[in-house]
Structure formats: C-alpha cells, structure tokens
Amino acid sequence: MSTTPTLSHLDESGQIRMVDVGHKTDTDRVAIARGSVRMNATAYGLLTQPGQGKGEVLNTARVAAVLAAKRCAELIPLCHSLPLAFVGIDFELDEAAYSVHIRATCRTQYKTGVEMEAMTACSVAALTIYDMCKAADKGIVIEQIRLQYKAGGKSGEWRND
C-alpha cells in the first residue's frame, strides 16, 4: 500500500499550519546535514594560515552554528521548538578545491525530528565562513547544503549518500 506524498504544513484547504505532534511519543532522533564553502586560493590561504584565520574563522562558525540550531524555531515559522541534546559541528579543509566542508549533527529525544536544526546549523556555519572571508573573495560559493542522514521516529532511518 503506497501513500500519496503531501505537504504536511498545509491543511486540507491549503492553509498553512503547524503540524500537531502532541500525540506522538518521544523517541531518539538524529540528523546530519552537510554543505561546503568554496573560495579562491587567496581566501583559502588566509583561512588556513597558521595563527591567522583557521582557528578564529572556524571557531566562530562553530559557535554560530550551535546558536542557529538552538534558535531554529525562531527562524523557520512552522518549525517546532525542541530540546536539543547535542549539536556537533565538524569542518574538513579541502585544499585541492579551496573549500571547507561542513558537517552538522543534531540529536534530541522528542516527538519530531531535528533535520531543520541540522540544516540551519550547517547553513549558518557556511554563512559565517562567507562573512569572515568575503573581504578576500567576493565570489565565495556556498553549495550542496543538504540532509545527509536522519534516524528516529515513524519514518525510521534515511540516507542521502
């Protein structure tokens, strides 16, 4: 038996609504989002120069990402406010592509998933890197922000590998 996909934030008449999760049971949930920031060689060199940018830029982006995950429900109108148990932000430097790859992981034990929190954290980390490097490269590209993994709840485990 297959079901027709629907937009859960629209009611039968097409009006927006916040999904009612009050009847759901709390379950362990995790989501991982990924994205990248690509820049020119000059900006990448400044970012990765010892004692220069890497520590400050990436630490600032990490803190911004954690704050963004915690405030997700304030930014996305129909997103539920939920208790985050964990937010982790990891960066991988890719010298060949002059890129910073971002991974945001969020966990909760709640009635709804943490996909939006992970996606928001990843997005804000990328925006923070952009902001702090834009003086050296006006053409920085934020790309491939996506949900990579989610687990928990009725829909179970999902991967985008």
From Swiss-Prot:
Which Pfam families does this entry report, sorted A to Z? MoaC
Asked if the keyword Ion transport belongs to this entry, the reply reads: no
* Gene Ontology BP annotations: Mo-molybdopterin cofactor biosynthetic process
Q: Where, by residue number, is the active site?
A: 131
Is tRNA processing there in the keyword field?
Answer: no
Q: Which InterPro entries match?
A: MoaC (IPR023045), MoaC_bact/euk (IPR047594), MoaC_sf (IPR036522), MoCo_biosynth_MoaA/MoaC (IPR050105), Mopterin_CF_biosynth-C_dom (IPR002820)
- Subunit note: Homohexamer; trimer of dimers.
**Name of the featured protein:** Cyclic pyranopterin monophosphate synthase
Which species is this record about? Bordetella parapertussis (strain 12822 / ATCC BAA-587 / NCTC 13253)
Q: Which gene encodes it?
A: moaC
